[in-house]
From Swiss-Prot:
This is Cobalt transport protein CbiM. GO terms for molecular function: cobalt ion transmembrane transporter activity. Its main location: membrane. It holds the Pfam family CbiM. The chain crosses the membrane at residues 37-57, 74-94, 106-126, 128-148, 169-189, 212-232. Keywords: Cell inner membrane, Cell membrane, Cobalamin biosynthesis, Cobalt, Cobalt transport, Ion transport, Membrane, Signal, Transmembrane, Transmembrane helix, Transport. Forms an energy-coupling factor (ECF) transporter complex composed of an ATP-binding protein (A component, CbiO), a transmembrane protein (T component, CbiQ) and 2 possible substrate-capture proteins (S components, CbiM and CbiN) of unknown stoichimetry. The keyword Manganese does not apply. It is a multi-pass membrane protein.
Length: 254
């Protein structure tokens, strides 16, 4: 059990260090995470129920990676801190809302989506408790969009590009960018399901929510893709001995 918790300790330290930076610069805007108490209780419970099985699988994958190579704990913590910092940067939107990167693509590519789901939930929990981003009742919904849907789409895109013999930088870029966008698509769907339009129903609400975030999220996704490629390349160069010939542990960490 101690072996499993060690990466969480490193992740906690990394997150607390990042908090100092975020508290020094924090724009006056609400984070894109669904805020505490915003969803009806039935929908909050629904998303929690969908999220829990992924966490169980994620814990098993995480334990498998740590047991195989304890030196991976530092990179696991770094992947979590990367997601924490990026998803805490709130960018105001001209539509009156705000958007932010997610940072989950890096961990999904390196370790697989199941592991990133656990790291993502930890990130969201810290943000809810320490930064008032999101909330505890909506943690299941936020986790499903950012810690599950985003990483699984990122992983799927990455594997698809690798199998098609695409350049690695392109595979990582598309994985991070499309995974970021998918997080917002799922969040928009969650809001549309909970608050359907009186006239157009769920479809109208979905279009409205997606339009609100599209103006800022598309350029943010591109920027996140570029940054993720840079960080991934640095990891491959300076920590290549920790990874198999494929360059990632994604297959082992699914």
């Amino acid at each position: 059990m101690k072996t499993i918790l060690r990466p969480f300790t490193l992740l906690s330290r990394s997150i607390f260090l990042a908090l100092f930076v975020l508290f020094l610069w924090s724009p006056d805007a609400h984070a894109m995470h669904i805020m505490e108490g915003f969803l009806p209780p039935s929908w909050s419970l629904f998303w929690w129920v969908l999220t829990l099985p992924f966490l169980v699988v994620g814990f098993r994958s995480l334990r498998k990676i740590v047991d195989a190579n304890p030196r991976m704990k530092l990179l696991l913590a770094m992947a979590g801190a990367f997601a924490f910092v990026l998803s805490s940067l709130k960018i105001p939107s001209v539509t009156g809302s705000c958007s932010h990167p997610t940072g989950v693509g890096l961990g999904a590519v390196l370790f697989g989506p199941s592991v990133m789901s656990v790291l993502g939930v930890i990130v969201l929990l810290f943000q809810a408790l320490l930064l008032a981003h999101g909330g505890l009742t909506t943690l299941g919904a936020n986790a499903f969009s950012m810690a599950i849907a985003g990483p699984f789409v990122s992983y799927g895109i990455y594997r698809l590009m690798v199998m098609s013999k695409a350049p690695e930088w392109l595979a990582v870029f598309l994985a991070a960018a499309i995974g970021d966008l998918m997080t917002y698509v799922v969040t928009s769907l969650q809001l549309a399901l909970a608050f359907p339009s009186v006239t157009g129903g769920i479809a109208a609400s979905l279009g409205k929510f997606m339009t609100i975030f599209a103006l800022t999220q598309v350029p943010l996704a591109i920027s996140e893709g570029i940054l993720t490629v840079m960080v991934f390349s640095a990891i491959r160069e300076y920590a290549s001995e920790l990874f198999p010939a494929s360059g990632t542990l994604a297959k082992e960490g699914v």
